[in-house]
Amino acid sequence: MTRLFGTDGVRGLANEVLTAPLALKLGAAAAHVLTAEKRVDGRRPVAIVGRDPRVSGEMLAAALSAGMASQGVDVIRVGVIPTPAVAFLTDDYGADMGVMISASHNPMPDNGIKFFSAGGHKLPDHVEDEIERVMDSLPAEGPTGHGVGRVIEEATDAQDRYLEHLKEAVPTSLEGIKIVVDAANGAASVVAPTAYEAAGATVIAIHNKPDSYNINMDCGSTHIDQVQAAVLKHGADLGLAHDGDADRCLAVDKDGNLVDGDQIMALLAIAMKENGELRKNTLVGTVMSNLGLKIAMDEAGITLRTTKVGDRYVLEDLNAGGFSLGGEQSGHIVLPDHGTTGDGTLTGLSIMARMAETGKSLGELAQAMTVLPQVLINVPVSDKSTIVSHPSVVAAIAEAEAELGATGRVLLRASGTEELFRVMVEAGDKEQARRIAGRLAAVVAEV
């Protein structure tokens, strides 16, 4: 049986894969698993539910809420709000679980559901497996009378609580910094510009008018050209691009050059080391982190640890090791002292705080690492499980690694959210990386 949960919750085409009946069952099962030990002294468990603006979000929120209420859980709906805000509010309200309805950077027709446990933590695999196990075994009858959960619509103070949290996390004045923010017509459309303005920055917001259908449409972190053009047009000091649920952030310097998650981690790691905030002098990245990040961290006397792709795995390593900074090349940056998951708005504030504290431009700060040429090809496949062990693929990888030697690397991995196999090659020369990646992709496509 195919596992329902991927690397970032349950995701699929809304109303075809991710249906209202499925959301109802998921809500009930998750409530049963996550609140089983919280029902003491007549206490009623509480869940926080947020969503991004896509049109299917209201339908799925209603179904999820009904499922949780059917298990005796009180549901507090917090409306359109970023994923990291749901994680924060789960802890801040003292709730027993949280749910975010979003498909992140995926197109509008998709949607997704991700759960948080008490404290705002993403679920480990074994808990997700338990939710799947009980989905079809819960009795049809649930609590009755006073035991039925309530649904509290749109808590009015949720956004203000989150904005105050961001202000406390990064109190540095950003006065004098001019920024363009691309909110992807998503969950950050109000929060991000408001947070940056509250910190003192001059803000030009683009793609910040969601209409239920335009989320991620030619905008946001997957269409970085939009913020690049706007930075040049307005003469801004930098640009920030968020994704649909605002748990990631990519940056652009004043000349329109991309500053990706690896570069952001490099500049923040060096800053935190200087300030005595980088615990154990360690940064946590993933296997997709550019080789240039490893080289830069070695030069700075910082240890780089790597995990599987997915900010949940970065988080697990951060928590297990007691580290204070981690993230992904895609722009998921995690600062455990201020949050339990990637937070695009917090990342943006942290970048600008470093600019304000040093008086340096983002372009200057980004020179903390040299990005090696990297080519990534996504290959559609029907069966991801057999690719990496197939003899022809094994032979092709060995040939590529022999050609690259110590000057580059090869990584093949299955996507956790789509029917794709990702072929990544890094090399000292872009053309060499492109040629080797193309060769490997062709082999994968034939398997």
From Swiss-Prot:
Protein name: Phosphoglucosamine mutase
Enzyme Commission code(s) on record: 5.4.2.10
Post-translational modification: Activated by phosphorylation.
NCBIfam families, sorted: glmM, PRK10887.1
Modification Phosphoserine occurs at: 104
InterPro entries for this protein: A-D-PHexomutase_a/b/a-I, A-D-PHexomutase_a/b/a-I/II/III, A-D-PHexomutase_a/b/a-II, A-D-PHexomutase_a/b/a-III, A-D-PHexomutase_C, A-D-PHexomutase_C_sf, A-D-PHexomutase_CS, Alpha-D-phosphohexomutase_SF
Transmembrane segments: none
Enzyme category, top tier: isomerase
UniProt KW keywords: Isomerase, Magnesium, Metal-binding, Phosphoprotein
Named cofactor requirement(s): Mg(2+)
Molecular functions per Gene Ontology: magnesium ion binding; phosphoglucosamine mutase activity; phosphomannomutase activity
Family label: Belongs to the phosphohexose mutase family.
Upper lineage: Bacteria, Bacillati, Actinomycetota, Actinomycetes, Mycobacteriales
Biological-process GO terms, alphabetical: carbohydrate metabolic process; peptidoglycan biosynthetic process; UDP-N-acetylglucosamine biosynthetic process
Pfam families from the UniProt entry: PGM_PMM_I (PF02878), PGM_PMM_II (PF02879), PGM_PMM_III (PF02880), PGM_PMM_IV (PF00408)
Cofactor: record remark: Binds 1 Mg(2+) ion per subunit.
Active-site residue numbers: 104 (phosphoserine intermediate)
Gene: glmM
Residues involved in Mg(2+) binding: 104, 243, 245, 247
